[in-house]
Amino acid sequence: QKLIDSGLRFHHVVAPQVWAWRSGRAKKYAKIFDKLYAFFDFELPYFTKYGLETVAVGHPIADGLIGKYKSQQSEKIITLIPGSRMSEVKRLMPLMRDIVDRLVRNGYRDYRFVIPTVETTESYIRNVVHDWAVTPTLVPSSERYDIYAKTYIAIAASGTVSAELAMLHVPTVVVYKMN
């Protein structure tokens, strides 16, 4: 409050998602910030109605993905995305194994299962999947968008990836396992 009262101007990058919950919070932000930078055009009215100067600057993921990767579903690929943090990978891999087992038992044996991995989880995932009914192919994270474009369906951790898959029009089951 002292900084605000001192006359400093405050610019906030990435608008709080008041459109998702508690839209009335926008009024509070209008009292704090002098200017707000939002990802999407539809966010502007939530803040401008309270007099907060708000500018849509685009979304770094959406702007780079939408229209760039065309669906190429000639292969039968089911992509498993257990996340990028080791804690979530350890929590979700048993669930992913159960899902793969069920899919294989129910006629999806001829599908290729793929898991994009980051460097910090690749070794762990490789050790976990070696004895699955069908061993998934591991690919580096740098190739994930090419894989997503070929994906029939994805089973993904909740997070940024679910937004990426939606932008690429990949049918996705989002999974989350609580402690």
Regions flagged by a language model, labelled:
Residues E88-K150:
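Donor-nucleotide binding loops and adjacent catalytic segments primarily
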Residues Q73-T79, Y111-R112:
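Charged active-site motifs of nucleotide-sugar-dependent glycosyltransferases
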Residues F10, T54, Y111, P136, ...:
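Hydrophobic anchor at the start of a short beta-strand
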Residues P45-G51, R126-D131, E164:
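Short loop/helix-cap segments at secondary-structure boundaries that form the rim of catalytic
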Residues Q1-K70, L80-L92, R102, V118-T120:
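Active-site and donor-binding regions of nucleotide-sugar-utilizing enzymes
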Residues S141-N179:
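A donor-sugar binding/catalytic signature common to diverse glycosyltransferases
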Residues V13, F39, V57, P116, ...:
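Generic beta-sheet signal
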